[in-house]
């Protein structure tokens, strides 16, 4: 068995599919480390990474169009197994001498493929059997183009009535391609296919487990910081909380957690954080009341991106100041996680478009005086939660709904004022309380209130009022890349609305956001 949990690893090249991060998460769930890189990576980087296997993701473009993305030629000469998914299969076929054609018919949604030849990728898996005795698999298709001719050395593994090459393989070189998406749950046996590729074909050992990740992180932290002191911004969110517990276990009293009450937190959150981490877990916490400083810095600013940058920069300024007051503090710890790194890095070709800057990555000033410690930067959110459970953090804290790094700064639309934050805090708390009371909190993936900077006429008793509007939002999602608005019961929505309007003086109207993602994002800013 290998000692380094990163030794056996898979490289995923991203061609732009909305499911690419899902591939990486599925590989990690198997117990194998993987990284996700842009498709236009240099050969030297692949050689240095030395993967046991390479996966080519799906993507929105057409292989038949000039200038569409291609895998580096080295991928097919690296001497390791290669697995092409959807667009990845098409570019593999094209680059190795086959042909891909645009089709007038497209195949989206559920499909049933028939296995026509055996392959290690599909070993001992089937969902049904055809009348002729052939294994059948239920899969999820999402493609327009299709392979018209497979390259020399390949054979057909599976087909559909529409797609003659639903799966292909060159067993000698260990090259595999599927036209469907094994990473999505709609492909019922997809996880087993990925496990066959990673474990059986690539020969990867399952070293990537919560206990081993913790041991590895502790060793790396100790190696990085030595006897130096570390300062961490503790918000009480999942990422910063798990970071705090990891650091506390690794370096103990060398860690000082700075808890900044920026005026953008949820109701009673400051008291809850201090009680849990200070009183219960015994961490060294330095509380800083900085509401006025943040609100002054944000005064007059309406642009969401600029608000995020201001909040991030103000945090760093405070950390710099507090570190200067402490002796020999050289390191700033952050709860940056892997999706932050992926989405902020983009593609080296410059084709990636920043939808929203990430609080942990995009807000760092160039002249920051402290070194960075980011023990979670290799982990997806679901992995962070599992690590937290292993470290002893409570389930209800780790699995509560996501809260953005900038806090209410991106849930108060437009300019941020203390009055708006106070109203929003109370409205949001009522919404969350009623979701718990109605046993709906754990049925939705995320729920929150948004302050709208518009006034609306209302009537309270015989009094006319002209007050602010609150929007409430609840969504259902598996991966947060797509989301459906939650169909909450009318009675629950009515109760939430009545409570907010009656109990939060200054609110005259409550609306329910019924936008999906896409086209809307989950957060309003």
Curated annotation (Swiss-Prot):
The keyword ATP-binding applies. Residues 9-207 form the Glutamine amidotransferase type-1 domain. Its EC number is 6.3.5.2. The active site is at 86 (nucleophile), 181, 183. It catalyses: XMP + L-glutamine + ATP + H2O = GMP + L-glutamate + AMP + diphosphate + 2 H(+). Keywords: ATP-binding, Glutamine amidotransferase, GMP biosynthesis, Ligase, Nucleotide-binding, Purine biosynthesis. One of its GO terms (cellular component) is cytosol. ATP binds at residues 235-241. Pathway: Purine metabolism; GMP biosynthesis; GMP from XMP (L-Gln route): step 1/1. PROSITE patterns: GATASE_TYPE_1 (PS51273), GMPS_ATP_PPASE (PS51553). InterPro entries: Class_I_gatase-like, GATASE, GMP_synth_C, GMP_synth_GATase, GMP_synthase, GMPS_ATP_PPase_dom, NAD/GMP_synthase, Rossmann-like_a/b/a_fold. Gene3D superfamilies: 3.30.300.10, 3.40.50.880, HUPs. SUPFAM superfamilies: Adenine nucleotide alpha hydrolases-like, Class I glutamine amidotransferase-like, GMP synthetase C-terminal dimerisation domain. Residues 208-400 form the GMPS ATP-PPase domain. Pfam families: GATase, GMP_synt_C, NAD_synthase. It is an enzyme of class 6 (ligase). One of its GO terms (molecular function) is ATP binding. Catalyzes the synthesis of GMP from XMP. Homodimer. HAMAP family: GMP_synthase. This is GMP synthase [glutamine-hydrolyzing].
